[in-house]
Regions:
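Preference for long, amphipathic alpha-helical scaffolds in soluble/luminal domains
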Residues: 1-205
Length: 205
């Protein structure tokens, strides 16, 4: 059976993770040759959820921010979904919820935009309002956060916590663990996830 060739986006990802230096020409060629990049940049929809999830996919590929298509997605999110206090799934400040805020923070970090106002607002939202324990009340003033399955009811949504911890770990790596508050939140999140066996997704433990 003939082995399938490795997509050039994966080659780019491995080189990036191993710290291998690549020239601008090499990066450009690897992006250009990638079937995955071609598929991800083939279509476009002028809608919040399309742009959110497309950016999340794109952000897994190093240097993808160089493409005009990626910049188009970033511009849509920055102009339409980045509220004053964090990322919102519809652009309204009262519709900031943990999972979407965290996913977009991580995507912006991977796209070398961790220091942007949009990413910093998302990070500040986590620092101020995310809870990592049961029976704690968030000081976030909008009720949307208790809809959609209950992001922060008596038992905070495990998806929101998991994505928030992942985003914080990605951000911490980018800034070389220079933010002690971020490190503290990561520790709190991991302790909570292990304590409640969240990695097993069991509701009876």
């Amino acid at each position: 059976m003939k082995e399938q060739a490795i997509d050039s986006a994966l080659i780019l990802r491995k080189s990036f993770e191993h710290g291998e230096a690549l020239s601008e020409i090499e990066i450009s060629e690897l992006l250009k040759e990638s079937k995955l990049v071609e598929k991800l940049t083939r279509d476009y929809e002028d809608s919040p959820f399309f742009n959110i999830f497309r950016l999340i996919c794109l952000s897994e590929i190093p240097f993808i921010e160089q493409l005009p298509y990626t910049q188009k997605i970033i511009d849509f999110i920055s102009n339409n979904l980045a509220a004053d206090e964090g990322f919102s799934y519809n652009g309204q400040g009262d519709c900031i919820v943990p999972c979407y805020n965290a996913m977009l923070l991580e995507a912006y970090t991977r796209l070398q935009m961790a220091k942007s106002n949009e990413a910093q607002n998302a990070l500040d939202w986590i620092k101020r309002y995310q809870v990592f324990e049961r029976n704690q009340r968030t000081s976030w003033r909008y009720g949307e956060i208790c809809k959609h399955g209950g992001c922060m009811k008596a038992t905070p949504c495990y998806i929101g916590i998991g994505k928030t911890v992942r985003a914080l770990i990605t951000y911490a790596k980018y800034i070389k663990n220079a933010d002690s508050h971020v490190e503290q939140l990561i520790e709190q999140g991991i302790v909570y996830m292990l304590k409640h066996n969240m990695y097993q997704r069991l509701s009876n433990q």
